[in-house]
Amino acid sequence: EATKFKQGIVVAQVNEIVDEVPRVDIPGDWVDFVVQAPKPFYVEPLFTRDPALITDSQVLRAMMVIKGIYGEYGIQRLNHGIGFDTAAIELLLPTYGEELGLKGKICSYFSLNPHPTLIPAIESGWVKSVHSFGGEVGMEDYVAARPDVFFVGPDGTMRSNRAFSQTAGHYALDLFIGGTLQIDKYGNSSTA
């Protein structure tokens, strides 16, 4: 949609041309051309991270962020970027965050796509709501099953609003944290 804001041309490559789709991430009248691909195109998940690839240093940084930034400043509403650092934070909330007594005090409201690494925090009652920029391949059934957390329409599909999420993600939250945490040798973080 950023292309359309600058008078660009938007071309959508699709597997099949149909009369109706359940949902799209941008308004249909912003799409100038629809082209059917000669063979089905595999859509890779954008935000899914294999937890086995999270390193010890990423876990350490996640623990530092949970205790030293989120806990210290009472970060309730946040926009998590993508990457292993934020995935580690999400996975540590029900264990390390719980140990610190931070449940209900941090990380209750998110502006982000539905990350699988957020599931343990959702299921353990940490996360109250998630407003998404868009979808995530493979998360459709989980999102539909949790209309109490995600914005879901009457047909069971997720409702997202990229423009609203981007605005909220930058101006209506306690903190935006990027996919790469920058911490200097003195422990100062660019995210605080």
Question: Can you say where each PLM-predicted feature lies in the sequence?
Answer:
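Conserved phosphate- and dinucleotide-binding cores of soluble alpha/beta proteins
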Residues: E1-H80, F84-G104, T117-A192
